[in-house]
Protein backbone atom coordinates (compact mmCIF):
# COMPACT_ATOMS: atom_id res chain seq x y z
CA UNK A 1 0.00 0.00 0.00
CA UNK A 2 1.36 3.41 -0.99
CA UNK A 3 1.30 6.08 1.72
CA UNK A 4 1.28 9.88 1.75
CA UNK A 5 1.45 12.61 4.37
CA UNK A 6 -1.69 14.41 5.47
CA UNK A 7 -2.72 16.80 8.25
CA UNK A 8 -5.54 14.88 9.93
CA UNK A 9 -8.19 16.43 12.15
CA UNK A 10 -8.87 14.04 15.02
CA UNK A 11 -11.02 16.25 17.22
CA UNK A 12 -8.24 18.45 18.58
CA UNK A 13 -7.47 22.01 17.44
CA UNK A 14 -3.99 20.67 16.65
CA UNK A 15 -3.90 18.69 13.41
CA UNK A 16 -1.81 15.52 13.30
CA UNK A 17 0.59 15.13 10.37
CA UNK A 18 0.39 11.40 9.63
CA UNK A 19 0.98 8.88 6.91
CA UNK A 20 -2.29 7.62 5.42
CA UNK A 21 -3.12 5.57 2.31
CA UNK A 22 -2.65 7.31 -1.02
CA UNK A 23 -6.08 7.66 -2.67
CA UNK A 24 -6.89 5.86 -5.89
CA UNK A 25 -9.13 7.29 -8.63
CA UNK A 26 -12.58 5.84 -9.16
CA UNK A 27 -13.97 5.45 -12.69
CA UNK A 28 -14.48 8.97 -14.06
CA UNK A 29 -12.45 10.49 -11.22
CA UNK A 30 -8.82 11.47 -10.81
CA UNK A 31 -6.07 11.91 -8.24
CA UNK A 32 -4.37 15.30 -7.90
CA UNK A 33 -0.99 15.96 -6.32
CA UNK A 34 -1.55 19.09 -4.26
CA UNK A 35 0.79 22.02 -4.86
CA UNK A 36 -0.81 24.74 -2.73
CA UNK A 37 -3.89 24.91 -0.52
CA UNK A 38 -5.10 28.14 1.03
CA UNK A 39 -6.13 28.23 4.69
CA UNK A 40 -9.81 29.24 4.80
CA UNK A 41 -11.81 30.48 7.77
CA UNK A 42 -14.60 27.97 7.21
CA UNK A 43 -12.18 25.09 7.82
CA UNK A 44 -10.61 26.80 10.84
CA UNK A 45 -14.07 27.34 12.36
CA UNK A 46 -14.83 23.64 11.94
CA UNK A 47 -11.54 22.75 13.64
CA UNK A 48 -11.90 25.23 16.50
CA UNK A 49 -15.58 24.61 17.21
CA UNK A 50 -15.62 20.88 16.56
CA UNK A 51 -18.32 21.27 13.91
CA UNK A 52 -17.32 18.18 11.91
CA UNK A 53 -16.86 14.65 13.28
CA UNK A 54 -13.24 13.37 13.05
CA UNK A 55 -11.22 12.06 11.37
CA UNK A 56 -11.04 14.37 8.36
CA UNK A 57 -8.52 16.08 6.11
CA UNK A 58 -9.58 19.67 5.51
CA UNK A 59 -8.42 22.16 2.88
CA UNK A 60 -10.42 23.21 -0.17
CA UNK A 61 -8.61 26.11 -1.90
CA UNK A 62 -6.62 23.77 -4.09
CA UNK A 63 -4.18 23.91 -6.98
CA UNK A 64 -2.16 20.92 -8.09
CA UNK A 65 -1.14 18.49 -10.79
CA UNK A 66 -3.10 15.53 -12.15
CA UNK A 67 -1.38 12.38 -10.92
CA UNK A 68 -3.67 9.51 -11.93
CA UNK A 69 -6.85 9.15 -13.97
CA UNK A 70 -9.81 6.86 -13.51
CA UNK A 71 -11.29 4.91 -16.39
CA UNK A 72 -13.04 7.04 -18.98
CA UNK A 73 -11.54 10.44 -18.14
CA UNK A 74 -10.87 12.39 -21.34
CA UNK A 75 -10.66 16.02 -20.16
CA UNK A 76 -7.24 15.71 -18.53
CA UNK A 77 -3.99 13.80 -18.69
CA UNK A 78 -1.35 13.08 -16.09
CA UNK A 79 0.83 16.15 -15.56
CA UNK A 80 -1.89 18.73 -16.23
CA UNK A 81 -1.99 21.58 -13.72
CA UNK A 82 -5.48 22.12 -12.34
CA UNK A 83 -7.64 23.96 -9.86
CA UNK A 84 -10.31 21.73 -8.32
CA UNK A 85 -13.51 22.97 -6.73
CA UNK A 86 -14.72 20.82 -3.85
CA UNK A 87 -18.44 21.53 -4.33
CA UNK A 88 -20.25 21.27 -7.69
CA UNK A 89 -24.06 21.04 -8.15
CA UNK A 90 -26.08 18.55 -10.18
CA UNK A 91 -27.62 21.29 -12.41
CA UNK A 92 -30.91 19.35 -12.56
CA UNK A 93 -32.70 19.65 -9.21
CA UNK A 94 -35.28 22.17 -7.95
CA UNK A 95 -32.64 24.40 -6.35
CA UNK A 96 -30.32 24.28 -9.34
CA UNK A 97 -33.18 25.44 -11.55
CA UNK A 98 -33.51 28.43 -9.20
CA UNK A 99 -29.72 28.95 -9.43
CA UNK A 100 -29.47 28.33 -5.66
CA UNK A 101 -26.63 25.91 -6.27
CA UNK A 102 -25.38 25.84 -2.67
CA UNK A 103 -28.72 24.30 -1.65
CA UNK A 104 -28.36 21.38 -4.11
CA UNK A 105 -28.01 17.99 -2.40
CA UNK A 106 -25.05 17.01 -4.60
CA UNK A 107 -23.38 20.38 -4.00
CA UNK A 108 -23.55 19.81 -0.25
CA UNK A 109 -21.54 16.60 -0.70
CA UNK A 110 -17.82 17.32 -0.66
CA UNK A 111 -16.42 16.12 -3.97
CA UNK A 112 -12.71 16.07 -3.09
CA UNK A 113 -11.11 13.92 -0.42
CA UNK A 114 -7.75 12.71 0.86
CA UNK A 115 -9.41 9.91 2.81
CA UNK A 116 -11.87 9.47 5.65
CA UNK A 117 -15.10 11.52 5.39
CA UNK A 118 -14.71 13.83 2.35
CA UNK A 119 -13.73 17.28 3.61
CA UNK A 120 -11.68 18.91 0.85
CA UNK A 121 -8.41 17.04 1.24
CA UNK A 122 -6.10 19.92 0.37
CA UNK A 123 -4.03 19.52 3.55
CA UNK A 124 -2.52 16.34 2.10
CA UNK A 125 0.01 15.45 -0.55
CA UNK A 126 -2.67 13.92 -2.78
CA UNK A 127 -6.46 14.01 -3.04
CA UNK A 128 -9.04 12.33 -5.21
CA UNK A 129 -11.72 14.19 -7.14
CA UNK A 130 -15.12 12.61 -7.79
CA UNK A 131 -16.39 12.23 -11.37
CA UNK A 132 -18.72 15.26 -11.22
CA UNK A 133 -15.80 17.38 -10.02
CA UNK A 134 -13.62 16.17 -12.90
CA UNK A 135 -16.42 16.86 -15.36
CA UNK A 136 -17.58 20.27 -14.15
CA UNK A 137 -15.37 21.49 -11.31
CA UNK A 138 -11.76 21.06 -12.45
CA UNK A 139 -10.13 23.95 -14.31
CA UNK A 140 -6.84 23.84 -16.26
CA UNK A 141 -4.23 26.33 -15.03
CA UNK A 142 -2.57 28.28 -17.87
CA UNK A 143 1.20 28.27 -18.21
CA UNK A 144 2.81 31.07 -16.24
CA UNK A 145 0.16 31.27 -13.52
CA UNK A 146 1.67 30.54 -10.12
CA UNK A 147 0.10 27.78 -8.04
CA UNK A 148 -0.25 30.04 -4.98
CA UNK A 149 -2.36 32.39 -7.10
CA UNK A 150 -4.33 29.66 -8.87
CA UNK A 151 -5.49 28.14 -5.57
CA UNK A 152 -7.48 31.33 -4.94
CA UNK A 153 -9.90 30.68 -7.81
CA UNK A 154 -12.37 29.16 -5.33
CA UNK A 155 -12.52 32.11 -2.88
CA UNK A 156 -12.60 34.58 -5.77
CA UNK A 157 -15.63 32.68 -7.08
CA UNK A 158 -17.42 33.02 -3.74
CA UNK A 159 -16.61 36.73 -3.60
CA UNK A 160 -17.77 37.34 -7.17
CA UNK A 161 -21.02 35.58 -6.33
CA UNK A 162 -21.44 37.95 -3.35
CA UNK A 163 -20.68 41.03 -5.44
CA UNK A 164 -23.23 39.99 -8.05
CA UNK A 165 -25.81 39.20 -5.34
CA UNK A 166 -25.51 42.86 -4.36
CA UNK A 167 -26.55 43.76 -7.95
CA UNK A 168 -23.76 46.30 -8.24
CA UNK A 169 -24.02 48.54 -11.28
CA UNK A 170 -21.39 50.71 -12.90
CA UNK A 171 -21.04 54.10 -11.24
CA UNK A 172 -22.42 53.00 -7.87
CA UNK A 173 -20.59 53.54 -4.60
CA UNK A 174 -19.81 50.38 -2.66
CA UNK A 175 -18.35 50.07 0.84
CA UNK A 176 -16.34 47.01 1.89
CA UNK A 177 -15.97 46.68 5.66
CA UNK A 178 -12.74 44.79 6.36
CA UNK A 179 -9.64 44.45 4.19
CA UNK A 180 -8.30 41.02 4.89
CA UNK A 181 -7.85 38.75 1.87
CA UNK A 182 -11.61 38.31 1.40
CA UNK A 183 -12.24 42.04 1.78
CA UNK A 184 -9.53 42.78 -0.78
CA UNK A 185 -11.08 40.34 -3.24
CA UNK A 186 -14.52 41.91 -2.72
CA UNK A 187 -13.06 45.38 -3.26
CA UNK A 188 -11.31 44.42 -6.48
CA UNK A 189 -14.33 42.55 -7.85
CA UNK A 190 -16.64 45.47 -7.11
CA UNK A 191 -14.18 47.60 -9.09
CA UNK A 192 -14.40 45.08 -11.95
CA UNK A 193 -18.16 45.65 -11.91
CA UNK A 194 -17.55 49.38 -12.32
CA UNK A 195 -18.15 50.58 -8.77
CA UNK A 196 -16.35 53.29 -6.84
CA UNK A 197 -15.19 51.42 -3.75
CA UNK A 198 -14.67 52.76 -0.23
CA UNK A 199 -13.04 50.43 2.29
CA UNK A 200 -12.38 50.37 6.03
CA UNK A 201 -10.07 48.40 8.30
CA UNK A 202 -8.14 48.71 11.56
CA UNK A 203 -4.78 47.65 10.10
CA UNK A 204 -2.41 50.26 8.59
CA UNK A 205 -0.78 47.49 6.51
CA UNK A 206 -4.09 46.39 5.02
CA UNK A 207 -5.24 49.95 4.41
CA UNK A 208 -1.99 50.72 2.59
CA UNK A 209 -2.45 47.63 0.40
CA UNK A 210 -6.05 48.63 -0.34
CA UNK A 211 -4.91 52.09 -1.44
CA UNK A 212 -2.34 50.55 -3.78
CA UNK A 213 -5.11 48.41 -5.26
CA UNK A 214 -7.30 51.43 -5.94
CA UNK A 215 -9.58 51.65 -2.91
CA UNK A 216 -10.49 54.83 -1.04
CA UNK A 217 -9.61 54.00 2.57
CA UNK A 218 -10.86 54.79 6.07
CA UNK A 219 -9.10 53.97 9.34
CA UNK A 220 -11.84 52.27 11.37
CA UNK A 221 -9.85 52.64 14.59
CA UNK A 222 -10.85 56.31 14.60
CA UNK A 223 -14.60 55.57 14.51
CA UNK A 224 -17.10 57.48 12.41
CA UNK A 225 -17.34 55.24 9.33
CA UNK A 226 -20.98 56.16 8.71
CA UNK A 227 -20.23 59.87 8.74
CA UNK A 228 -17.27 59.42 6.40
CA UNK A 229 -19.37 57.43 3.95
CA UNK A 230 -22.01 60.16 3.94
CA UNK A 231 -19.39 62.79 3.22
CA UNK A 232 -18.09 60.68 0.32
CA UNK A 233 -21.61 60.15 -1.08
CA UNK A 234 -23.01 63.69 -0.82
CA UNK A 235 -25.02 62.72 2.26
CA UNK A 236 -26.85 59.81 0.66
CA UNK A 237 -24.97 56.70 1.83
CA UNK A 238 -23.54 53.75 -0.08
CA UNK A 239 -25.52 51.89 -2.71
CA UNK A 240 -24.22 48.59 -1.31
CA UNK A 241 -22.13 47.49 1.67
CA UNK A 242 -20.21 44.21 1.71
CA UNK A 243 -19.22 42.90 5.14
CA UNK A 244 -15.85 41.16 5.34
CA UNK A 245 -15.60 41.57 9.11
CA UNK A 246 -17.59 40.01 11.94
CA UNK A 247 -19.20 41.47 15.04
CA UNK A 248 -22.08 43.72 16.01
CA UNK A 249 -20.03 46.89 15.50
CA UNK A 250 -19.13 46.26 11.86
CA UNK A 251 -22.69 45.10 11.16
CA UNK A 252 -24.16 48.29 12.68
CA UNK A 253 -21.71 50.39 10.68
CA UNK A 254 -22.72 48.56 7.50
CA UNK A 255 -26.43 49.18 8.09
CA UNK A 256 -25.79 52.81 8.99
CA UNK A 257 -23.59 53.40 5.94
CA UNK A 258 -26.18 52.11 3.46
CA UNK A 259 -28.51 54.52 1.67
CA UNK A 260 -32.29 54.00 1.70
CA UNK A 261 -33.04 51.15 -0.69
CA UNK A 262 -29.43 49.99 -0.60
CA UNK A 263 -28.12 46.46 -0.20
CA UNK A 264 -26.17 44.91 2.68
CA UNK A 265 -24.34 41.60 2.16
CA UNK A 266 -23.14 40.03 5.47
CA UNK A 267 -20.62 37.88 3.62
CA UNK A 268 -18.49 37.17 6.69
CA UNK A 269 -21.37 35.72 8.74
CA UNK A 270 -21.03 32.03 7.90
CA UNK A 271 -21.22 30.38 11.33
CA UNK A 272 -24.56 29.14 12.57
CA UNK A 273 -25.39 30.82 15.85
CA UNK A 274 -23.70 34.05 14.75
CA UNK A 275 -26.40 36.54 15.72
CA UNK A 276 -26.68 40.32 15.46
CA UNK A 277 -29.31 42.71 16.72
CA UNK A 278 -31.04 44.83 14.10
CA UNK A 279 -33.83 47.41 14.23
CA UNK A 280 -36.19 45.86 11.69
CA UNK A 281 -38.50 48.85 11.83
CA UNK A 282 -35.68 51.19 10.86
CA UNK A 283 -34.49 48.77 8.21
CA UNK A 284 -37.96 48.40 6.71
CA UNK A 285 -38.78 52.10 6.80
CA UNK A 286 -35.60 52.83 4.85
CA UNK A 287 -36.25 49.86 2.52
CA UNK A 288 -32.72 48.58 3.05
CA UNK A 289 -32.16 45.00 1.90
CA UNK A 290 -30.08 42.34 3.64
CA UNK A 291 -28.91 39.95 0.94
CA UNK A 292 -27.77 36.48 2.01
CA UNK A 293 -25.23 34.58 -0.05
CA UNK A 294 -23.16 31.47 0.55
CA UNK A 295 -20.36 29.54 -1.16
CA UNK A 296 -19.48 29.42 -4.85
CA UNK A 297 -21.51 29.45 -8.07
CA UNK A 298 -21.05 27.65 -11.37
CA UNK A 299 -22.59 30.71 -13.04
CA UNK A 300 -19.40 32.70 -12.39
CA UNK A 301 -16.94 29.80 -12.43
CA UNK A 302 -15.41 30.59 -15.82
CA UNK A 303 -15.27 34.34 -15.21
CA UNK A 304 -13.75 33.96 -11.74
CA UNK A 305 -11.00 31.72 -13.10
CA UNK A 306 -10.30 34.15 -15.95
CA UNK A 307 -10.07 37.10 -13.54
CA UNK A 308 -7.50 35.19 -11.50
CA UNK A 309 -5.47 33.79 -14.39
CA UNK A 310 -5.40 37.09 -16.30
CA UNK A 311 -4.24 39.06 -13.27
CA UNK A 312 -7.19 41.47 -13.41
CA UNK A 313 -7.67 40.62 -9.76
CA UNK A 314 -4.28 41.08 -8.12
CA UNK A 315 -3.69 38.17 -5.78
CA UNK A 316 0.07 37.64 -5.60
CA UNK A 317 0.34 40.45 -3.05
CA UNK A 318 -2.31 38.81 -0.89
CA UNK A 319 -0.40 35.56 -0.33
CA UNK A 320 1.91 36.78 2.42
CA UNK A 321 2.69 33.58 4.35
CA UNK A 322 3.37 30.06 3.05
CA UNK A 323 4.16 27.02 5.19
CA UNK A 324 5.16 23.42 4.47
CA UNK A 325 2.70 20.70 5.44
CA UNK A 326 4.86 19.85 8.44
CA UNK A 327 4.05 23.32 9.85
CA UNK A 328 0.30 23.22 9.23
CA UNK A 329 -0.46 24.05 12.87
CA UNK A 330 1.83 27.08 12.77
CA UNK A 331 0.00 28.20 9.62
CA UNK A 332 -3.41 27.85 11.26
CA UNK A 333 -2.15 29.61 14.40
CA UNK A 334 -1.05 32.54 12.24
CA UNK A 335 -4.48 32.57 10.60
CA UNK A 336 -6.09 32.71 14.06
CA UNK A 337 -3.79 35.48 15.27
CA UNK A 338 -2.43 37.27 12.19
CA UNK A 339 0.70 39.38 12.34
CA UNK A 340 0.57 43.01 11.27
CA UNK A 341 1.62 42.09 7.74
CA UNK A 342 -0.42 38.88 7.38
CA UNK A 343 -2.98 38.55 4.60
CA UNK A 344 -3.49 35.12 3.02
CA UNK A 345 -1.94 32.07 4.67
CA UNK A 346 -1.28 28.99 2.52
CA UNK A 347 0.07 25.47 2.83
CA UNK A 348 2.64 24.93 0.07
CA UNK A 349 3.20 21.18 -0.32
CA UNK A 350 6.21 21.89 -2.52
CA UNK A 351 8.07 23.20 0.55
CA UNK A 352 8.03 19.77 2.17
What are the residue ranges of the model-derived segments?
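C-terminal hydrophobic helical "lid"/dimerization subdomain
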Residues: 1-6, 252-256, 298-352
Amino acid sequence: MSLMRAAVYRGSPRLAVEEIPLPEPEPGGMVVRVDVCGVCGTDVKKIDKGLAPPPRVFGHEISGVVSALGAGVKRFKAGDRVVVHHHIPCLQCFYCELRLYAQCALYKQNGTSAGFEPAGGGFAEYLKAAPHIVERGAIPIPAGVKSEVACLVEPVNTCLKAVDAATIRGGETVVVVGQGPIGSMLMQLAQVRGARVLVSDLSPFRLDLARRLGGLTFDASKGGLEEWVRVETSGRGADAVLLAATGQGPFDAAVGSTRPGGRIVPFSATSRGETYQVDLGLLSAAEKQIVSVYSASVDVQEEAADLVFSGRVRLQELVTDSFPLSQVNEAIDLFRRPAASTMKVAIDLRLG
